[in-house]
Amino acid sequence: SLEKQIERAFSGKKISGVALIINSPGGSPVQSALISERIIELSKKQNVPVFAFVEDVAASGGYWLACAADEIFVMPASIVGSIGVISAGFGFVEVIKKIGVERRVFSKGENKGLLDPFQPQNPDDVKVITDLQEEIHQQFKDWVSKRRGNRLNTEVVKKEGIFEAKIFSGSKACEVGLADAIGELKQVLRERFDEDIIFKGTDSSTVITAL
């Protein structure tokens, strides 16, 4: 499992740090949060820094995860950001009418059939979903603000629409504070630690150890 891979990354002796290689357009906010909290917990326990290296993309849940690192490095053309929440679906009301299908649903609980795609869209149902999205979006914004700290300028956040699900190139992400610098994993870490540093990889992260 991913948790075991992360634990293995932090389990070596004389670890100088852990590098996360991130290439993700996003996913579940819950899973992103759980993984991030575990990384931070192990980082504090082992007293080692964590570095995130974004390859093609760290968007939405992928960026949530990147924020678990102490520093975020990107490539100039990496895609970074998308700090927002989305849900999507389809409506099949007219389709079942045309093909002559009668749908029968039996449920208990007023909201059990929330946003049923075979029923006309109900404004009350939509409000339930948008309220939930607003809550999760605020959690995401709070997390980014907490982890990036004073590297995020309040005026820049508003001007650039950072918390409005906007995406940025790696170069621009560095300018607005979503990333720290341009850099490739081995080059950055050799400059930071030692030219003779040893890289020990797992499926999900790289353990950095000095000779």
What are these regions (language model features)?
Residues 1-75, 86-211:
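N-terminal organellar transit peptides
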